[in-house]
Amino acid sequence: MSASTQQEPSLILITGMSGAGRRATAAALEELGWYVADNLPPELIVRMVELSFSDDSPIEKLAIVTDVRSRDFAGNLTSVLHDLHTGGRRPTVLYLDATDEALIARFDAVRRTHPLQQKGTLQDGIDREREMLTSIRERADIVLDTTNRSIHDLRRELEKFFAAADHSSVRINVQSFGFKHGPPKDIDMLLDARFLPNPYWDPELRPFKGIDAPVSDFVLSQPGAQAFLDHIVGLIHSVLPGYRKEGKFFVSVAIGCTGGHHRSVAIVEELTRRLADDGVLVNLSHRDLER
């Protein structure tokens, strides 16, 4: 990728599944100081960007929300991305997603029909939209699954990505999780800490979690734990230059154990400390710690 088309940290294109939280995302970004243009058809995006970043415009950070209600949405948006790249801008594409069950529950709660439902069922509309958006999801820089996220959770995630003072480096989002709850969907790397002994089976350690010293000390002292961390840190450092060259500035790493309470939590805490000590921009979260 040439220098003229590096990722533009001041420009976000927000799209994704209807009901996945586009409006909540727009509101959160406004609170973070972004100028948000909502429900903009793809054919108007390039012009909006040109006007917003003209010399006499006061706008410094622009987020544009667009959805499938426009005709040939995926094709038009792909064309827009090409035109923006040609013009020297590479926006961060944020794709919001959720499970079918979560989307159906949200539509039922507000008693709304899906924009692509037509005369069919709500599921028909969701299926149609997923098919239409497949290519856009594949091109997204960030895929954010909102299934189990409250509005407050969503805002915290957006803060991690878009409220940082330094947007010139790759930001690593590290999270722990429990495999019994399913792996996260919005990740770039997935690692398994279940090869380590489980503190759950020690009656003295069972009341504690991976953020507590007794469990953390136990996990990190196990054979293989330090080598595991060394390999992860080395892997991340080895791929950062490539991600930066490709204009990918947000990378999600997930480390799992059985329940997401002990081993993965301790490993993620230590990994975050090591990366931060190395000067890497890193965020930390524990998805299943309170389950």
From Swiss-Prot:
Q: Which SUPFAM superfamilies match?
A: P-loop containing nucleoside triphosphate hydrolases
Does the entry feature the keyword Iron, yes or no? no
Pfam families documented for this protein:
PapZ_C (PF22740), RapZ-like_N (PF03668)
**Any idea which UniProt keywords this protein has?**
ATP-binding, GTP-binding, Nucleotide-binding
| A GO term for molecular function | GTP binding
Q: Which residues bind GTP?
A: D67, V68, R69, S70
Q: Which InterPro entries match?
A: P-loop_NTPase, RapZ-like, RapZ-like_N, RapZ_C
- Positions of ATP binding: G16, M17, S18, G19, A20, G21, R22, R23
Q: What does this protein do?
A: Displays ATPase and GTPase activities.
Question: Family per UniProt?
Answer: Belongs to the RapZ-like family.
Q: What is this protein's record name? A: Nucleotide-binding protein jk1004
Protein source organism: Corynebacterium jeikeium (strain K411)
Q: What is the lineage of its organism?
A: Bacteria, Bacillati, Actinomycetota, Actinomycetes, Mycobacteriales
